[in-house]
Amino acid sequence: MTNLPAPHRLSRRSFCTLSAVALASLALPARRAFADETAAAAGDAPIVIVHTNDVHCAVDENLGYAKLVNYVDTMRSTYGADNVALVDAGDAVQGKAMGTLTNGEYLIDIMNKCGYDFAIPGNHEFDYGMTQFNTLVARAKAKYLSCNFTDLRTGNLMFDAYTMREYGTGDGKKKVAFLGICTPETLTKSSPVSFQDESGTYIYGFCEDDSGLKLYDAVQRAVDQARADGADYVVALAHLGQKGVTARWTSTSVVANTSGIDVVIDGHSHELYAQTPLNKNGQPVLVTQTGTQLVGIGQVVINPATDTITAYASDYAKTVTASTTNGTASIIETWDGIDAATAAYIVGLQAELAKITERVIGTSDVRLVALEDDDYTWAVRAHETNLGDFVADAYLALAWHGGVMADVGFVNGGGIRANIEPGDVTYGDLIDVQPYNNQLCYVDTLGQNILDLLEAGARNLPDPNGGLQQVSGLTYTVRTDIPSSVQMPGGTFGGVTGEYRVRDVMVNGEPLDVNRRYKMVSHTYLIVEGGDGLTMFKNDEAVLLDLDNKALIEYIQYDLKGTIGSEYANLAGQGRIAIKDGPDPEPTPLPQPEPEPAADPAAGPGGKPLARTGDPTGAAVVGAVAVAAAAAATGAVAVGARR
């Protein structure tokens, strides 16, 4: 048997910040201990699981699929083809032009070329509708799994909850159960209508409730059944995540409320981590995620000979490593080998689309950002950006082009998916920014609904939230020191029970009137379908406009005359959203001049008193005006301030 290579301890990527938990000890007590040394050479062959998540159509970016295939082939030649599995934890088929223009089919074809064994649906696998989702699953060679994706009409699961794979032979044979867990956020993070019948009744579900118990019970039933079927190890493929995710549905919450899972290969939140949270019996479970867009490849090794589980990388790769004397955890971030056949296959698919995607729409003098400077963390979900301003302005302009004089335009931060770099702006670039082909629409709605929309979108700040609204025609302030009291029963908006965090809302320079009706333009995902659980417009009648990426094209060509210019130069936007962690300080009154004392009448010539210099009444009036002006100026600056 081949020895496992020793892990490395190398510096992290500049864009990656691993949590303190990920840097903690990874030691596991008893039979589920991590190996701190190379696995023993004798005994059963190690079981290697290479994993990806949230690739989002990044077929040749960062590591890319061609390098992934070469890496997997190297592992198979090292440890034996039958001992290596390739799995994906969701959100592979949507996010860029290749996905949008082929409804995800080219991405499934590439995954087939890579040789994936098992996969689970992320929320974005459903973005093309349920019919197309079923087409993609049928097209895939990988087996899809889920223990909680349910047909509510029958109560049956849509996929097998788990599948069993045997490793080794004879007395050394081991069974590994691969189990799928979908995020219940799928109901609102994809298009809700995909899961409803024509009457709007939900006919599919993901074991969602307000406590998390339905999900935990579904997972536990599947784990118990897998153990009863003889599983020696249970590996969960989970599209759950942690940061910015509904707390009861995070991977750590699922681990804390279940038992019997050995490994959680996670996704959804686009984070890099390797952790060992405790399950409900106090036993540590390996939870690992590799970020997004193939910035990393994960690898888990189960060594039956020593009964250990290790998440680490091969000698052949540089690694992001969390290591102590008791354990190691790593994510592969660079790899030199490329599978030529896979690379050529991807180039061929891209060439077929190039005549569409490479059409130049205009130019940009500036960089427009959806991501922070690390090109990894979502900026548009945490604060205003110039790209958020640009997209919202384009929505509003599209309505105006159609003769609809809308007051405000909104776009959810989660719907803005890529930066625009200076230089030529192509059709493919704009599809990457808005890959969903959402239909725009407008609605006459109460100001109260607009206030509730802003409040719900800002409920997680300063943590990111895909429902944060980027705006046009409107400015607002968020006070993050005020606890959010937004109610989201079942993941949908249920009202605000306390003080609003959102305030100082101005529509075209005038305070928002909660009792007045405004014309608002956005997309059907928000207004009609209640995406992100934002259902406050369900009683308003929407009027359809054009597609979201069509709005961007028209805005560049007609309103901006072909060039995105200096008005969008500030990456932080134009001061439409102010995020504060406390109230503005009270303005300091301007110092007042002391009135001159009255003269001594005896000192005046002829015994007469001297006249006063100045008019104290007039001085007091001037001082009051100055203080009021200073207060007004301070308030104006505060509204426009950014963190």
Which functions belong to the PLM regions below?
Residues 30, 620-621, 638-639:
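Alpha-helical hydrophobic membrane-insertion segments
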Residues 16, 36-328, 382, 387-397, ...:
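Acidic, metal/ion-coordinating pockets
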Residues 624-643:
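C-terminal membrane-anchoring or membrane-association module
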Residues 42-48, 52, 57-58, 69, ...:
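Catalytic centers of hydrolytic enzymes
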